Curated annotation (Swiss-Prot):
Positions where N6-(pyridoxal phosphate)lysine occurs in the chain: K38
Gene: alr
Top-level taxonomic group: Bacteria
Entry protein name: Alanine racemase
InterPro entries, A to Z: Ala_racemase, Ala_racemase/Decarboxylase_C, Ala_racemase_C, Ala_racemase_N, Ala_racemase_pyridoxalP-BS, PLP-binding_barrel
Keyword Isomerase appears in the UniProt entry: yes
Length: 375
């Protein structure tokens, strides 16, 4: 039996991703480009995006957060090297090593566990050592890097392929001085080791914010995340050279007229102040539309911006069309994207919710069909 399409769908413009990664390539110079495709490529579809990026050589590496994410890519035939950015876990270490996924080593215990697993499997595990230069999340401090690197060089079954850190405030102007000091501290630690050890094959620290706004120094790879999907990590930056790749589209399923005093939705949180028309749209928080946008968010219908009214339900929400609307059942509804001369972005949603564009696109659920264009 043919599968019915979902009530809403996301359209991913792969040519936009290509254009965004061209911006990254230009900033990276001769450095390698790692493209983060974790969280299903930030909601854009990891397998399809990775295939496209590999086919056209828009990136040299891919990054994931879990071994399962990496395995999905390997099983789909992706051959680009894949780095698991989060710490190597004992329970999926064997699967990672067998699949050729590069592992992140954060301390001596992790190193020992990777070494034992690699020796037992008879496979060399390639690792990247994480340094905590200010993020406070994973890795040892820069002053411990030399000792951990020496231990890794001695460990059986392990090949040190890279060393990296992560910059927590590279995306805003007020973080420039801290980021500069952080980069200097990390690179000094790396340089001291390389003077007697020899160079690390890969040294990387630049996330999207650093790629767009900082000196990349003597690094050999950059890590593009949200920038590849068309958003600056600083939502207040004016980046005309970035193109959001994802649009989210639905349609009107019902239109009715309400009178003054009529209420809409659970909790009766919205009351009509005039006779107006209300449209129902078959998208809800189960699809990834945050309930926090109730009585806050907006959509595009027939080229005009209309407010979401009442509480967003699990599977539906309502829109105030105004008293003179000629919107009908079946009309296109744009949640993210462009319609005629109007555009709504993930940044617009994020600002209303006090969050970031990353969370908006990652939250769009599997219930929403994806379609890829621009190949």
């Amino acid at each position: 039996m043919p599968r019915c399409p979902s009530p809403s769908h996301a359209i991913i413009d792969l040519s936009a991703i290509a254009a965004n990664l061209a911006v990254v390539r230009k900033r990276a110079g001769d450095r390698k480009v790692l493209f983060a495709v974790k969280a299903d490529a930030y909601g854009h579809g990891a397998v399809e995006v990775s295939r496209y990026v590999e086919k056209h050589r828009y990136a040299d590496w891919l990054a994931v957060a879990t071994v399962a994410e990496g395995q999905e890519l390997v099983e789909a035939g992706i051959t680009l090297p894949i780095l698991k950015l989060s710490p190597a876990d004992p329970w999926d270490m064997d699967a990672a090593i067998t699949s050729g996924i590069r592992l992140t080593v954060v301390d001596f215990d992790t190193l020992e566990a990777v070494s034992k697993a690699a020796v037992r499997l008879g496979i060399t595990a390639k690792i990247h050592i994480a340094v905590d230069s200010g993020m406070g999340r994973i890795g040892l401090r820069p002053e411990c890097l030399a000792e951990l690197t020496a231990a890794a060089d001695r460990a059986k079954g392990v090949e040190v392929e890279g060393v990296f850190t992560h910059l927590p405030i590279s995306d805003v102007p007020e973080g420039a001085e801290f980021t500069r000091r952080e980069i200097d501290t990390f690179m000094t630690a790396v340089s001291l080791i390389e003077t007697h050890r020899g160079p690390f094959p890969l040294v990387h620290l630049a996330n999207s914010g650093a790629i767009l706004g900082h000196d990349l120094g003597k690094t050999s790879m950059v890590r593009a995340g949200i920038v590849g999907y068309g958003y600056d990590p600083n939502p207040h930056a004016d980046r005309a050279d970035l193109h959001p790749a994802l649009s989210w589209i639905s349609h009107v399923t019902f239109v009715k007229t309400v009178s003054v005093g009529d209420t809409i939705g659970y909790g009766r949180t919205w009351t009509a102040s005039e006779t107006t028309k209300i449209a129902t749209v078959p998208v809800g928080y189960a699809d990834g539309l945050s309930r926090g946008l109730s009585n806050k968010g907006h959509v595009l219908i027939r080229g005009s911006v209309h407010p979401i009214v009442g509480r967003i339900c699990m599977d539906q929400f309502m829109v105030d069309l105004g008293p003179d609307s000629n919107v009908t059942v079946g009309d296109e509804v744009v949640l993210i994207g462009t319609q005629e001369d109007e555009t709504l972005t993930a940044d617009d949603m994020a600002e209303l919710l006090g969050t970031i564009s990353y969370e908006i696109t990652c939250a769009i659920s599997k219930r929403v069909d994806r379609y890829w264009v621009g190949q």
